[in-house]
């Protein structure tokens, strides 16, 4: 089944060119089916690029997904046209009285900024708190995972001396967990962050299920027992060239970034990289939609209740 998005969203044409099944609102309204309601809080600067990446992963599921986009505030964006934001993005005030099947909170380039110094920190806390009573399952990606751990477990920010950048091998620790269903014993996924997600630290200070780890990157995937909060510390949504573009950006800003690990052939930035994590990303999002969202959410979202959720 397709994702359902606004008719004129730029991502629609990109995804159609990739032969991804996208259904416009005008067609979807004629179908007698209850689509999943998923809202994406997009914190990344290049919002069109990011929304396209996440929509691509959400599309590879037998479930019909009705996607809405949420912005954190109404400040002018340096990287996204105001017309695009005004046309396709909701303000929190306009959706706070509604319920959703799923919420995705993207990463943000704030790895070295303390939480209290993030200009929209209080607003983000409000949205995360709201989700407890209005969203079946929330997916926190990269920086958002760190922010979610702060809100839910009061964990302070832990930062590496050097940025973690590259494609790392991860080990599947819970083969029979629904989120990991169909995963290989080991799989690759990209990382691009300063945050330090130590398995020992999370085990000592939370009751999370640690689902997948990497020797170099630490915890990659974790979940609360009821699967209502899922944390992904890397970037399974990244395109094949996203790490490359970040590397060039940092070089252009006079920084001395490391060459992303296990990314370029022969570690040569002049040779185009290949995406080695694409199938993993699609399976992760399909499992989240099915086992964390669809299997737990009420048919009538007006009947949202904590009693709907299991801790299996």
From Swiss-Prot:
The keyword Cytoplasm is annotated on this UniProt entry: yes
Name of one Pfam family that matches: HTS
Binding-site residues, substrate: 163, 192, 249
Cellular localisation: Cytoplasm
MF terms (GO), sorted A to Z: homoserine O-acetyltransferase activity; homoserine O-succinyltransferase activity
Keywords annotated in UniProt: Acyltransferase, Amino-acid biosynthesis, Cytoplasm, Methionine biosynthesis, Transferase
UniProt record, GO biological process: L-methionine biosynthetic process from homoserine via O-succinyl-L-homoserine and cystathionine
CDD domains, per database record: GATase1_HTS (cd03131)
Enzyme Commission (EC) number: 2.3.1.46
GO cellular component, one term: cytoplasm
Important for acyl-CoA specificity, annotated site positions: 111
Chain positions of site Important for substrate specificity: 192
Reaction catalysis annotation: L-homoserine + succinyl-CoA = O-succinyl-L-homoserine + CoA
Keyword Kinase: no
Main location: cytoplasm
Protein task: Transfers a succinyl group from succinyl-CoA to L-homoserine, forming succinyl-L-homoserine.
Family that this chain belongs to: Belongs to the MetA family.
Name this polypeptide is given: Homoserine O-succinyltransferase
